[in-house]
Amino acid sequence: MINGHGNNIQGLQHLLKADFSTNVFDNPQTGDLLDYLQTQLRAIRNYPDSECRLLREKLADKFNLSPGYILVTSGSTEAFYLLAHAFQKQCSAIRTPAFAEYEDACTLYNHQILFVEDLNELNNVKPSDLVWIGNPNNPDGRYLRPQQLVAFLEQNPKRLLVVDEAYIDLCEAAESMASLVGQHQNLVVIKSFTKLFAIPGIRIGYLLAHPQIIKKLQACHMPWAVNALALKAGEYILDLPEQPTVALDHRLQESKRMQAELAQVAGFRVFPSPTNYFLCELEQATAAELKKQLLKRHGFLIRDASNFRGLRPGHFRVAAQNKTLNNEFIHALKACINAIQPCLSYPSH
């Protein structure tokens, strides 16, 4: 449900200089993709392939799986709702803080929901049927290596582990679990084209799982759920040759630099992240007030993360931009913190 999400910039353009709230990556190749889609507009005159066969074949080649392991969805969020629907009224454990749609989807389909901060906690709580994690996680960038997740799969053969890898391409030295779904029947991996190519408006994602799970999900999937241009976009992206990741590497280095510099600010906590985004916490002020002041005084937008389950009023998320903007943001952030922290506070828990 959209209320669980972050910023809506439609009414803020007149104030906005730079958006540090969004954790998509402005890939240099996105312009070429948009040019290509301009040449494919006639595709909307026909119904799209309801089975997404060409895109599934390309994904199967990429991950060395058969197409029967793949379901293409209208963005990764649709995959969450399909899973919750197919396994309705079961018990789901969600590692927090987490993307709100895991909980929203499970609530909609009457799951009993457990919240844990670490997978190890599951040994001490009522057994769950499904376990949901972001890897890397949103909003804090936590990342678990495949070896850790494989160990969990082997120790919990009756639990279905749902791994959301929407941000895996924006995580330093990360390894996907996608190719392992052929070895573990209790593994579901959800992926997206959105974050690396900055195309959230196209709505194209996919899910990888054992064919028995895929068939269960297909029974809940409405016909023509993925539109023709979204399919064209996915096919185009998968046909791109491997490109040097210089721009992304620079962005990740900038994220590290920002984290290190902001960690030195008094009354301010930075949660280390290997991604282009990271979580912060103000000790004596609210993220809502900081967001207001940053936008009003400097035109910078951050993500108030206080509505993530388990987080506090001082939590907010930052996504690194280019070096010039990042330097301006750091200066602005320090100025705003100095202005608001002496007079604002909230109770500790």
Language model features: what each stretch is:
Residues M1-N46:
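N-terminal "arm"/small-domain region of PLP-dependent enzymes with the aminotransferase-like
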Residues Q29-D32, E51, N186-Q264, F268-F271:
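PLP-dependent aminotransferase class I/II
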Residues G31, A285-K292, T324-E328:
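Short, conserved charged micro-motifs
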Residues C52-R53, P67-Q90:
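Conserved beta-loop-alpha segment that forms the PLP phosphate-binding cup at the N-terminus of a helix
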Residues H85-P139:
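PLP-dependent aminotransferase-like
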Residues L119-E121, K126, P139-L161, E165-I199:
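Active-site pre-lysine segment of PLP-dependent enzymes
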Residues Q147, K296-R297, G310-H349:
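PLP-dependent enzyme catalytic core of the Aspartate aminotransferase-like
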Residues L252, V265-H298:
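Conserved PLP-binding catalytic core of the aspartate aminotransferase-like
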